[in-house]
Design a protein with these regions (language model features):
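Mobile "lid/hinge" segments at catalytic clefts and subdomain interfaces of large enzymes
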Residues: 82-201
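Glycine-rich anion/phosphate-binding loop at the beta-strand->alpha-helix junction
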Residues: 35, 45-96
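Generic, ordered loop/turn and secondary-structure boundary motif
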Residues: 2, 9, 14, 18-19, ...
Length: 204
């Protein structure tokens, strides 16, 4: 996933002689990872085709964050394409101001929020959670996740409707098969060494 924010999306032009965009910002890189995490596990495990998702922010205000819209755009694009994928997914951000949950809070609301939660998932399960908070209880966090998932179900149903209306048939591919005999030999040769490497507390 490649998420790009251009300054012209906010009505600005870069300064300097060349007036070109620089490398992706840290926020753009983190957003790319945020969108990639819930999407990646839903591809068939034996699919070996390279899939690139490019998300370009064309216009945005300074009050609403474009990350969730980009995640939904990626979900819709994959759903209506011919790429095999076990979506759709939906994504929601949740804040909490004065003890009240707020879905997709604005920039001003986020400044006063004691919870910053992003949830992504399918109609049946939550796939990804990213959260930061100023001391919220376990029950409050659980309720926020459940609230987010209820909204995600609605978004998934909406995207499924789009897929039904304009989606392409998924292409057929030849599954990648693992040589069982070779797998067993590799497992016998190095499994214990791998386990030892993962469990060691030696930093050298």
């Amino acid at each position: 996933v490649d998420y790009l924010e251009r300054t012209y999306a906010a009505g600005k032009i870069p300064g300097g002689f060349f007036r070109r965009e620089g490398r992706p910002t840290e926020k753009a890189i983190i957003t790319s990872r945020l969108i990639d995490r819930p999407i990646r596990p839903l591809f068939p495990k034996d699919l070996r085709n390279d899939v690139a998702i490019n998300l370009l922010v064309l216009s945005v205000d300074n009050d609403n964050s474009p990350e969730i819209a980009a995640m939904l755009g990626a979900s819709i694009a994959l759903s209506i394409s011919d790429i095999p994928w076990n979506g759709p997914i939906g994504g929601v951000s949740v804040g909490m101001v004065d003890g009240e949950y707020i879905l997709c809070p604005t920039a001003e609301q986020r400044e006063h929020s004691t919870l910053e939660l992003t949830v992504a998932g399918t109609e049946k399960k939550v796939v990804m959670i990213e959260a930061g908070a100023k001391e919220v209880s376990d029950d409050e966090m659980f309720d926020a996740i459940m609230l987010a998932h209820e909204e995600i179900k609605k978004l998934c149903a909406f995207i499924a409707g789009i897929q039904t209306e304009i989606g392409k048939p998924k292409f057929e591919y030849t599954p990648s098969e693992i040589d069982a005999e070779l797998y067993d030999k590799i497992k016998e040769f190095c499994l214990e060494d791998i386990r030892s490497a993962y469990s060691t507390d030696d930093k050298n």
